[in-house]
Amino acid sequence: MSEVLTIDTTSGVVTEEILEQLRLFGENHPMLSVAIPEYKEPLPNPTMKNLVARLKMTMKLYNGVGLSANQCGIMQRVFVIGTEHFQIACINPKVVAQSEEISKDNEGCLSFPAMFLKVDRPTWVDVEFYDETGAFKQIRLDGLTARCFLHELDHMNGVKFIDHAGPLAIQMARQRQGKLVKQLVRINKNAKKMGNKK
């Protein structure tokens, strides 16, 4: 749970809002395979503002760099990308141009814990979207930011990152995932034992 203070600069009114973390759904949730329709409500609005704040908070809690609403069981065409200190919300996101040059790099996904796959993506993309204030944005993204945008846009279109990989790559990634999960469980058990000794 997180507390957010909002100050209306025209009236000077301060409002307090308690935000609850969103529930994150795993890879087999059917909503991850559904294309999300365009968001039609006028912006800004309190419902979208609250959803974006909760997406940002949840992404930060899971140490992610991107999170889409449908990963949390919410059928809204919005995602957030960014780091701990800077996040942007993308409502009705679109790619309007992309590089011919392709880059292959590792990607993970909060809905696929401890799983990583090499995925081909354009090195840059020109994108359009609305932020939670209703401002229309047209920007060029490159590198990791472009990769995150495209990964989350795939979620909006019902595409999972494993859909970009072949069966052998997925099998190898599953094996690495299993080993990593076992290591994390072992580390967690050892940490609990150490905590109980104090």
Please place each PLM-identified region on the residue numbering.
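Positively charged
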Residues: 1-198
